[in-house]
């Protein structure tokens, strides 16, 4: 499947298919030099898939740390200095091969190297079906996740579904959180459909039907980011579950998707408090437990600590913490939430796990 962005200009293709990696070679010839920034774990499993590409004299491989460990100032400087030592021009490509963190990091390198060079995303996880599309790139600060970054469109996204075959179950769980988030944004019928399809751990682990829902998720995100690239309006909806989730992820060092799922449950509780919504919290807890999410992290949450991270969230403004909330399916809002309500919701969340 080939999707295409529909901005007024500077559009890019998104290839979603088995064997999509073959498209990389069609781009290599266009650049003076290319640097493949590859996650160390992906390199262990799939190094041979890039042998043909690396046979080009102008293509270099840079192995970077896996996951969020790569999104540091130190790794950023080291990578830039290595690339600059090759006397690059602006007709250079940075090719990100890995999960969401790899794409974030490599994209920020591309955005800032010589004030911007070509950037190709080659996501290798389910989670990265979300982050590879839309142009958000960045690294982390001691104050929180993704606080240093840019909006920078890729030249192409090449999503080879063959990479998913070797994903450990923890990464499947983490990635499914973003697939599920897109279903929630689409509405009640889509949410019910995906819950009925991936109804237990065994089916989710098999990845049966995942191709379809990944493509749907990308289409959902494209509709939103093309309408609001710089996150002034509806693009904020894509942060569903992320305000609380990012804080939990950063403080408890758990997988991104696991934290987002906790954040999704939390926002349902906040919506119930603020709007008298009628979200069935136990339903979502039961569903996520059946899939195998380790929700016991919730019992260890200290609100005051999490709240400090929430205050650093880049979506906030002078009025304080902003959250995306599903009032009812089809009615999504971005709302300022006071500290008392946030604490009350956290206390309620923990009562489900006593």
UniProtKB/Swiss-Prot annotation:
Keywords: Amino-acid biosynthesis, Aromatic amino acid biosynthesis, Cobalt, Cytoplasm, Lyase, Metal-binding, NAD, Nucleotide-binding, Zinc
Protein location: Cytoplasm
Gene Ontology terms, MF aspect: 3-dehydroquinate synthase activity; metal ion binding; nucleotide binding
Catalytic activity: 7-phospho-2-dehydro-3-deoxy-D-arabino-heptonate = 3-dehydroquinate + phosphate
Entry cofactors: Co(2+); Zn(2+); NAD(+)
E.C. number: 4.2.3.4
Ligand binding (Zn(2+)): 178, 242, 256
Record-linked InterPro entries: Dehydroquinate_synthase, DHQ_synth_AroB, DHQ_synth_fam, DHQS/DOIS_N, DHQS_C
GO cellular component: cytoplasm
Cofactor binding summary note: Binds 1 divalent metal cation per subunit. Can use either Co(2+) or Zn(2+).
Pfam families assigned to the protein according to its UniProt record, in alphabetical order: DHQ_synthase, DHQS_C
Annotated pathway: Metabolic intermediate biosynthesis; chorismate biosynthesis; chorismate from D-erythrose 4-phosphate and phosphoenolpyruvate: step 2/7
Tree of life domain: Bacteria
Ligand binding (NAD(+)): 100-104, 124-125, 136, 145, 163-166
GO terms, biological process: amino acid biosynthetic process; aromatic amino acid family biosynthetic process; chorismate biosynthetic process
NCBIfam families named among the record's database cross-references: aroB (TIGR01357)
HAMAP family (UniProt xref): DHQ_synthase (MF_00110)
Function: Catalyzes the conversion of 3-deoxy-D-arabino-heptulosonate 7-phosphate (DAHP) to dehydroquinate (DHQ).
Protein family: Belongs to the sugar phosphate cyclases superfamily. Dehydroquinate synthase family.
Protein name in UniProt: 3-dehydroquinate synthase
Organism: Staphylococcus aureus (strain JH9)
